[in-house]
């Protein structure tokens, strides 16, 4: 599906396929998918467990290689990059947010956010400055020195979002980012996503929850490795954010 009303897409995939196994055991987790995503767009890809949405996200983010097809980010063909090139791509161009947070337990919130900036080549001083700026942006400047074990689920996910932004990525990919959160924490995180999208950052979120998908600009339904439906959403993100968390409108 190739809907794009904002000029050249920042993400483009053509004929994207991911296969596992062989012969009678061959499974196509992603089956000849085409996708365009515009700059500043919030796209939700939804579907049941096992439909291929997380596999697709991993392909778009360079965490896995496709069996066939092409992936482009701002005119650069990602699927042809070397392993070293893919590592650089993941480090500088993409921010990842996962359901399980994946924070380092022995590091403070600030140190978790600093780490990708340091790995990306920033000086310790610049990494600290960037981490403080991002923790303030996600409303956790007063929790900078806390270990993840001392933070709530919503706070840990906000740290993870700050970490994803440490190297100013072109796009953020989120895999069930609110799956482990209660309603209040879900609303908290989705409001943050909405603010970042409004500021021009591009998001792709995969989810099985229609309420979460309804907070995006566009929603694609996926089943058995293929796109089966697409909808442009115009209902207003603030109302959708409140409704998705069950907190009223």
Residue ranges and their predicted role:
Residues 9-227:
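ABC family nucleotide-binding domain
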Residues 1-19, 232-249:
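ABC-family P-loop ATPase nucleotide-binding domain
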